[in-house]
Amino acid sequence: MAKTKSRGRRVEKSADKLEKKAQSLFEDTKSTGEEGGDDSNEIDASLKSPFFGLVDSNELDYFKQAESTLNVNAFDSDEDREGFIRSVLEEARGKELKLVTNQICSKLMERLILFASDRQLKNIFGQFSGHFVALAHHKYSSHVLETLLVRSAALIEKELIHDDSSQNEEEREEQEEGEVTDPMEGLFIKMVDEFKPHLQGMLEHQYSSHVLRLLILILAGKELPSTTTSNSTLRSKKSKIARKMIEIKDNQDFNKSFQTPSSFKIQLRELCNSVSNNQNSKRMRELAIHKIASPVLQLLIQVEGLVDRDRTFWHLIFLKDSEDKNSQEEAFVEYLLSDSVGSHFLEATIKNDGARIKYIERLYKLYMEDRILKLAKRSTTGVYIIQALLFKLKPVDVEHILDEIIPELSNLISISENQNLDLGQRLIDASISRGNYRRDEIIEQLFLKFAPNYNVQDPQLKTTSEFIENVLQLTGSTLGNTRDDWPTAEERRRSFFLEKLMEYDYKFVICVWYNFLALPVERFIQMCFHGVFSHIVERALVVIPSSEGEPKPVLILRKRVLNLFKDQIVNMSCNSYGSHIVDALWNFSVLLPMYKDRIGTELQGDSHKVKESTYGRLVWKNWSMELFVRKKYDWKSLIKQQEQAYYGVNDENGTTSRVKKPIELKMEKLAEERRLREEAAAKSESGYKRRHEDDNEDDYAKKQKLRGRRR
């Protein structure tokens, strides 16, 4: 057969173009950091799909069965489970590397690590020694390695706290059996030394970058977040979903920070130096907008202050705080403000405590202060930077941002396109933290956007349901669907937004009541049984505090709302969502004993159905229905106690103190947090000035100070 002729001219031209483009793009990086580039190429060549052998078919069946047994966890006692784990580890001895690189067996190894004892954990760690870099770059073993690192961090803290002398006898036994007896701290440092030559290559690797993030968190003594629930700094959204599907749950070592030895600070400093070595601004800015390397760089900026006063990573990306506007930096910041990865990087560096406030203020003053409104209109990028700045800048700058955005708030928010709902909530929080700054204007803008025909000062019963229709988008939602559709993420976001508005000001609660009355009763009852919209009904059932005094029209309106639940109490009590609403009606019907009695009568009328339901029994208990049925006088005494609590609780002096509203409690909490931040900042600043003065003193002044002359 004749050889196939490869296409020549077009391929050569395209290859030449790509080569020239790459050369021009990375010319600066190569000229300043040639050694680092060569090292990363060596890493890629040496870590091509590490292969430690195949698992035998018979072994695979055994380990697969063991994995399912551990997943079910149907052991009679912890001793039975420990014996089972011991036998599986005995069978897996010498095959650990094959198992962790196998898709099915890697899940088994992860479960074994989660349940392993301290001795077993050290033995597994010892088996991986010398292969950590290869395992970190593998699709399956990298997850096993992350779990091993978390358990190792917990064991290091345990060894630090407990006295080693009590373990000498046990260690001798281990040594006789040929097991690993070194302290976990030493084993961990050896592993870090394995990673050091390859750190720059790990930054951009799909799997090893996650291991590197976890390594940084452990060395810095930071909290190790969950891998399945919260917005984890360890895993991507896709990875968290996958872990939920394979049903691997975290143990008690996650969502915690661990005590670390002093040697870890040295290791963290060396790690940071290894990453930043031979790097220039161009290269670091490329990493900042790289979708894999960017989260690692965010973490390095967050922790570098622990070991580096010069903030090397920050100043490789941005200029020093004493320098003026720079055209290249301006172009880079503009890209961060308009790119999804870049905006997330800048938002994270602002939110985290790693970067100094003066660094953030410099970027704000030079590149963002004059175009707040323009950035707020970038609903997928720039607006998140603005939200982060609201809680980092000085009060004067925060008020400037509020002054720019509040007059245009109605134009910035778009419910139908799910744009800037978070901005509205953050503005409310910022307004509260500034002592309800421009509160009335915010309320006016929100009503202008969602209920332009609603008269806030003099609402009428003829009010339409436009407010909740515009906010929740009930038309076209899953409300009333008979196919058991799950509520969508958009419906949850809108629901949270409306709950925030009702918490912010009681005017929104009154408006929601009028909208409930304007809805068809069937539509309203459907909301009570909906997984998301039922929360709106529940949050709307709040009463004006007695200190403010409930006007008579509002009291009458409250009665009208209670009438909407007539003949629906039993069905709602037996529903997982509606039962919470019935519980809330106890407080909502305060000062209205007749309505309480009517609800109790409904529950008693079909008590058999209510008591058969799990949720119904809870409602029966919360409404004290046993007293209602058997001791009506005692039940009415509960109502009297509730009314007394509503008007205020008598203290020892005989005075009456009212219960504070949630917004007042939140303002007090924010004020306390602000006070603590200011105290910490002042303390840090005074310490820095004192050290700076000491450095600038001449030798004679230092001697005089030591002698006690300058007290």
Swiss-Prot record:
N-terminal signal peptide: none
List the taxonomic lineage. Answer: Eukaryota, Fungi, Dikarya, Ascomycota, Saccharomycotina
Q: What is this protein called?
A: Nucleolar protein 9
Query: What gene does this protein come from?
Result: NOP9
Function of this protein? RNA-binding nucleolar protein required for pre-rRNA processing. Involved in production of 18S rRNA and assembly of small ribosomal subunit.
Give the species this sequence originates from. Scheffersomyces stipitis (strain ATCC 58785 / CBS 6054 / NBRC 10063 / NRRL Y-11545) (Yeast)
Cellular component annotations (GO), alphabetically ordered: 90S preribosome; nucleolus; preribosome, small subunit precursor; small-subunit processome
Query: Compositional bias (Basic and acidic residues) spans?
Result: 9-33, 676-702
- Quick one: where's region Disordered? 1-43, 161-180, 676-711
Which key words tag this protein in UniProt? Nucleus, Repeat, Ribosome biogenesis, rRNA processing
